[in-house]
Amino acid sequence: MSHLLTMSELSEVEISEILKDAEDFANGKESKTTEQTFVANLFFENSTRTRFSFEVAEKRLGLDVLNFSADASSVQKGETLYDTIRTLESIGTKAVIVRHEQDRYFDELKDQVNIPILNAGDGCGNHPTQCLLDLLTIKQEFGRFEGLKIAIVGDVRHSRVARSNAEALTKLGATIYFASPEEWKDEDSTFGTYKPLDELVPEVDVMMLLRVQHERHDHYETDIMKEYHERHGLTVEREKRMKEGSIIMHPAPVNRDVEVASELVECERSRIFKQMENGVYVRMAVLKRALPNVLGGMKHELLV
C-alpha cells in the first residue's frame, strides 16, 4: 500500500518517479479518473497552502473530495483517529490526507488501515509533500541536486520542513547547512552542519528560510522574536551578498520582515510563490502514486 508518511521511506528512484509525474503535470498533462473515487482531507491543524493545494490537486484528477471538520465530527465525542479513518474506509473512501499535531501520529495507523495515508504534516516531525515540492522547485532551477549547497535557516528545532528536506537533499547528493538561534537548534540532526548565517549567504545555491513558529514556542523566547530579523533573517543587505544565480525559498506562511524582508518575498531571486504552484503538481503526483488502480492504470484517461 502506497502510504506517504516520511521522506525516509522513499528511495531515490521513487523520488525521481514522483518528480517526473509532477513535471508532467506542470507541463500540461492531465490524468482524470473515469470512475467515482472518494478521498478525505483530515486537517487537525490550520492550513492554507497544503489543504487547498491538495483539494485543487484532487479535483484536477477528477476525485470526489470529502473535507473533514474535527469541530463538527465525532472527534468531539472522543472518537479516535483510527476509528475516524476506519469509518471513512468503511463508507468507501479510497485515501486519506492527514495533518495532525501529534508527531508520528501514523505509527499506530499504518499497519491497521487498508487505505493509503498521505501525511500532510505531523507535529514537528515530517512534511513529505512540502519536501517534494521543494525538490521539484530546486530541480526546475538547477536541473540537479548533486553538489548543490543548501542553507536551511531559522527555527530548525520545531520545523518538520527542515527535517524532511535535510534528509532528502542529503540522500540526493546536496550539502546541507543550518543557521539558527541557539535556542532553536536541533542538536539531534545528522544531516547538516551549523554555520553562522553571514558565512553562508555568499556560499549557498539555495537559501531556504523557515517560518518562526509562534504556536510551538515557549514564552521565554519572546525576546529573541523581537530582534530575529536583524540577527537571523534575510535582510535586504544580506540578499545583496548572495551568490549569483542563487534562489530564496520559504515554505510559507511568511512572517514578513521576520524571516525575510518584505520586499524580497517577490524579488527576482524568490521562488516562494513558485513553490506554492508546484505544490499542486506534486500532490497530484503523490495521489497518482497512492491510487494506481484509479489514476495510474486502466481506469484513467490521459489527456495531453
Curated annotation (Swiss-Prot):
One Gene Ontology term of the molecular function aspect: amino acid binding
**InterPro entries (UniProt xref):** Asp/Orn_carbamoyltranf_P-bd, Asp/Orn_carbamoylTrfase, Asp/Orn_carbamoylTrfase_sf, Asp_carbamoyltransf, Asp_carbamoyltransf_Asp/Orn-bd
Q: Which enzyme class?
A: transferase
Sorted alphabetically, the keyword list is: Pyrimidine biosynthesis, Transferase
Keyword Transferase attributed = yes
Reported EC number(s) for this entry are 2.1.3.2
- Pathway assigned to this chain's UniProt record: Pyrimidine metabolism; UMP biosynthesis via de novo pathway; (S)-dihydroorotate from bicarbonate: step 2/3
Kindly give the Pfam families that the UniProt entry links to this protein. Answer: OTCace, OTCace_N
**GO BP, sorted A to Z:** 'de novo' pyrimidine nucleobase biosynthetic process; 'de novo' UMP biosynthetic process; amino acid metabolic process
Chain sites annotated for binding L-aspartate = K77, R160, R211
**Known catalytic reactions:** carbamoyl phosphate + L-aspartate = N-carbamoyl-L-aspartate + phosphate + H(+)
Where carbamoyl phosphate binds, per the record, is at R49, T50, R99, H127, Q130, A252, P253
Keyword Transferase attributed: yes
Gene Ontology annotations for the cellular component aspect, listed alphabetically: cytosol
Q: What protein family does this chain belong to?
A: Belongs to the aspartate/ornithine carbamoyltransferase superfamily. ATCase family.
Subunit text: Heterododecamer (2C3:3R2) of six catalytic PyrB chains organized as two trimers (C3), and six regulatory PyrI chains organized as three dimers (R2).
Please give the function described in this protein's UniProt entry. Catalyzes the condensation of carbamoyl phosphate and aspartate to form carbamoyl aspartate and inorganic phosphate, the committed step in the de novo pyrimidine nucleotide biosynthesis pathway.
What name appears for this protein in its UniProt entry?
Answer: Aspartate carbamoyltransferase catalytic subunit
Its source organism is Bacillus cereus (strain G9842)
Taxonomic lineage per UniProt? Bacteria, Bacillati, Bacillota, Bacilli, Bacillales
* Underlying gene: pyrB
